[in-house]
């Protein structure tokens, strides 16, 4: 792929592009990343999915929380833009875990990089999914939905399912109102914190990034609901 993007840039120097690359491959090929930057790559999409190592293991992602953070820091150091995607709602996430995901996004200064729909994405379990082999899934799924082509599932904590519904409604309305990503992030955080605190969570405050936002506008897809 390197000769391809180099040749493309040589012939069409004003042309920009984006790529999709796994976190593990970004780590393995970090020496080649400046080539993307120098040949017009606007951003790199990567399916991060979660920042919880247990969940990443269940999803067999091939990277860890630390790997993701390492890649983001390297991107920031060399001037590349990360466009991370997540499966924020899955059968193993907790209110505290969801807040942790938001905190990591804020602390890594990625609020402008994350499309707000990513805060509401729910795991889809298809007919051939390897997740069906997990004992923790068996008790949560319902009969296969032929129309949707997925196995519907419910979270063990009904509050988490309700939070997902509330957040996707919030994101949809915010998109229609053309709200800024930082504003949407703050609203999502508040909704999540309202669920966390009644469950016994204490001592959490808003991420510093909400008050001292550093990130500038990040290149992004023209279709914000693309996942």
Each model region followed by its residue ranges:
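Short, electropositive alpha-helical surface patch
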Residues: 4-10, 94-111, 139-140
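C-terminal structural cap/anchor segments
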Residues: 71-75, 82-87, 96, 101-104, ...
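Flexible glycine/acidic-rich beta-alpha junction loops that bind and position SAM and/or redox cofactors
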Residues: 54, 58-59, 88-97, 111-153, ...
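Structural recognition of alpha->loop->beta junctions
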Residues: 35-43, 102-121
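Radical SAM enzyme core and accessory elements
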Residues: 130-227
């Amino acid at each position: 792929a390197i000769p391809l993007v180099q040749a493309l840039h040589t012939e069409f120097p004003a042309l920009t592009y984006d790529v999709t690359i796994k976190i593990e491959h970004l780590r393995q090929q970090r020496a080649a990343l400046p080539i993307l930057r120098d040949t017009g790559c606007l951003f790199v999409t990567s399916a991060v999915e979660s920042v919880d190592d247990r969940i990443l293991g269940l999803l067999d992602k091939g990277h860890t929380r630390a790997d993701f953070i390492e890649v983001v820091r390297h991107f920031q150091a060399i001037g590349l833009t990360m466009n991370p995607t997540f499966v924020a709602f899955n059968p193993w996430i907790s209110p505290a875990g969801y807040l942790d995901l938001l905190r990591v996004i804020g602390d890594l200064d990625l609020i402008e990089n994350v499309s707000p729909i990513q805060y509401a994405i729910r795991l889809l379990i298809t007919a051939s999914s390897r997740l069906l082999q997990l004992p923790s899934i068996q008790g949560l799924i319902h009969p296969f939905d032929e129309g949707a082509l997925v196995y519907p599932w419910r979270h063990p904590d009904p509050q988490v399912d309700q939070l997902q519904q509330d957040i996707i409604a919030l994101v949809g309305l915010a998109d229609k109102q053309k709200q800024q990503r930082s504003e949407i992030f703050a609203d999502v955080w508040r909704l999540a914190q309202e669920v966390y605190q009644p469950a016994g969570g204490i001592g959490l405050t808003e991420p510093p990034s909400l008050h001292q936002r550093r990130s500038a506008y990040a290149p992004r897809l023209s279709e914000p609901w693309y996942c």
